[in-house]
Amino acid sequence: MLREFSRCNVADNSGAKEVMIIKNLGGSIVRSTNIGDVVVVTVKKAIPHGFVKEGQVLKAVIVRTKRGLMRENGSHIRFDDNAVVLIKEDGTLRGTRVFGPVARELRDKGYLKIISLAPEVL
């Protein structure tokens, strides 16, 4: 569960290294987000000569959270860090690679491109 002003790692090669969540695009009264939710982020740290620059405001999909999630079969899955993948306005990925494991629940939300690029799906 991530809230506004939470800082996350970026799990793709778009050029950003760390972002801060500034808005949840769920339309929900609950302000927290979970895996598969779309959020508005601002880039806090970026590599030089990357696709994105520091200070840019972009959309992102949450792919890993430290809090984890409970599956229907009763198992609980947690990750070591909070991570997002940057997307464009039309929903396509900004980067061409995805680093680290991602949750299987992204398939249910329709992010098949992230699933196919990820090295491991848990």
Swiss-Prot record:
Ribonucleoprotein among keywords: yes
GO terms under cellular component: cytosolic large ribosomal subunit
Entry keywords, A to Z: Ribonucleoprotein, Ribosomal protein, RNA-binding, rRNA-binding
Source superkingdom: Bacteria
InterPro entries: Ribosomal_uL14 (IPR000218), Ribosomal_uL14_bac-type (IPR005745), Ribosomal_uL14_CS (IPR019972), Ribosomal_uL14_sf (IPR036853)
GO function term, MF aspect, one: large ribosomal subunit rRNA binding
One of the GO BP terms on file: translation
Coiled-coil region: none
Oxidoreductase listed as a keyword: no
Family of this protein: Belongs to the universal ribosomal protein uL14 family.
Assembly description: Part of the 50S ribosomal subunit. Forms a cluster with proteins L3 and L19. In the 70S ribosome, L14 and L19 interact and together make contacts with the 16S rRNA in bridges B5 and B8.
Function: Binds to 23S rRNA. Forms part of two intersubunit bridges in the 70S ribosome.
HAMAP family reported in the protein's UniProt record: Ribosomal_uL14
UniProt-recorded name of the protein: Large ribosomal subunit protein uL14
Lineage: Bacteria, Bacillati, Mycoplasmatota, Mycoplasmoidales, Metamycoplasmataceae
Gene giving rise to this polypeptide: rplN
